[in-house]
């Protein structure tokens, strides 16, 4: 994840978030303090003001990624410019087991998050802009509507005629119309932001990548072009991870973790690239043959994942060029404005 190191921050605040409340845990003058506040902006700001009055000015919140429930705390901390880290729940689960903690309550979870922050000193998350949060939310809504549309179409197979059939068909068409409207809204938001628009146009230049795939990458992978190839592959969940221990040292690596919906979005452009992109096609054939050829079960799937990784690395490389070009352009503009404003020329 794109992040900044912040080990100099002294007070870590563990925040366990639920629908209506936030349980908080932090150390103040060597004493562990536990409290609970409402999950709304006013209560969060009040808590931060009170804790700062105790001279606890260096704050670093530790919270798990809990979807929409964490949105209020996320945006409030971002607007107040207070550092925080969104931790993968898998990491905190493993940390709890390593500490021998088997009980699970909101209070204990907040204490574990605070303990995790002090011991692991995680990097601070660089918060997304409002436009990026909106894009992700819109795309996740699109995924939900596609799933619902598929379910309605499956129901239509069991109703061949009559009122039930007509209602089901109307529902499927209505959902399809909403999906089209969502696609238009996503396109407008991408085009409204210069960086996203240039990234989108650069992706369309790559053989095999279409409008839907480019939109998905921008919505679900805002880190594109800011990380190296290995990091971006792991983030997408297409990097081979070794599982070797004891006598199992000869077992092959497998993909694990990553962003599931992003992998799904990469599948179709990769299939297209395997046909139309000569570099990806040659890579697919090479990997498949190395795994035993077309007649060996699973060889094609392994080759396809390898091609997804290669395609994503290429997209990441092109996105990095776009970002570097934008930075140079901004730097040149800034230099020109400074030169014009200078009295000594």
Where are these regions (language model features)?
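Gly/Thr-rich phosphate-binding beta-strand-loop-beta motif of the actin/hexokinase/Hsp70
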Residues: 2-27, 113
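Short, glycine/acidic-enriched loop or turn micro-motifs at the edges of active sites
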Residues: 19, 67, 91
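Nucleic-acid-processing active sites and adjacent nucleic-acid-binding tracks
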Residues: 30-60
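Acidic, metal-coordinating catalytic cores used for nucleic-acid/nucleotide bond scission
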Residues: 62-73
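Long, charge-rich intrinsically disordered scaffolds of nucleic-acid metabolism proteins
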Residues: 85-206
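Phosphate-backbone recognition surface of nucleic-acid-processing proteins
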Residues: 211, 217-300
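Low-complexity, acidic/Ser/Thr- and charged residue-rich accessory regions of DNA metabolism proteins
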Residues: 247, 284-345
């Amino acid at each position: 994840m794109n992040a900044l190191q912040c080990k100099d921050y002294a007070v870590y605040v563990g925040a366990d978030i639920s629908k209506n409340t936030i349980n908080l845990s932090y150390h103040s003058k060597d004493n562990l303090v536990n409290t609970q506040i409402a999950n709304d902006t006013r209560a969060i700001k009040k808590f931060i003001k009170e804790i700062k009055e105790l001279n606890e000015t260096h704050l670093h919140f530790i919270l798990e990624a809990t979807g929409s429930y964490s949105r209020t705390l996320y945006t409030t901390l971002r607007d107040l410019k207070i550092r925080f880290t969104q931790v993968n729940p898998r990491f905190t689960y493993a940390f709890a087991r390593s500490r021998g903690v088997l009980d699970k309550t909101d209070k204990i979870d907040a204490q574990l998050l605070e303990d995790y922050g002090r011991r692991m000193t995680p990097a601070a998350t660089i918060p997304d802009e409002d436009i990026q949060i909106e894009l992700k939310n819109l795309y996740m809504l699109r995924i939900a509507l596609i799933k619902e549309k598929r379910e309605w179409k499956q129901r239509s197979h069991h109703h061949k005629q009559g009122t039930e059939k007509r209602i089901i068909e109307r529902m499927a068409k209505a959902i399809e119309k909403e999906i089209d409207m969502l696609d238009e809204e996503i396109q407008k938001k991408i085009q409204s932001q210069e960086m996203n628009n240039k990234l989108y146009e650069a992706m369309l230049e790559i053989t095999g990548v279409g409008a839907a795939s480019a939109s998905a990458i921008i919505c679900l992978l805002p880190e594109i072009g800011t990380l190296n190839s290995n990091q971006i592959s792991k983030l997408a969940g297409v990097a081979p991870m070794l599982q070797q221990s004891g006598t199992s040292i000869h077992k092959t690596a497998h993909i694990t973790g990553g962003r599931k919906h992003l992998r799904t979005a990469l599948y179709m452009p990769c299939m297209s690239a395997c046909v139309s992109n000569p570099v990806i096609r040659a890579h697919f054939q090479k990997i498949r043959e190395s795994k035993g050829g077309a007649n060996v079960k699973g060889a094609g799937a392994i080759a396809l994942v390898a091609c997804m990784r290669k395609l994503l690395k290429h997209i990441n490389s092109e996105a990095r060029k776009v970002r570097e070009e934008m930075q140079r352009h901004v730097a040149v503009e800034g230099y020109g404005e400074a030169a014009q404003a200078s009295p000594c020329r």
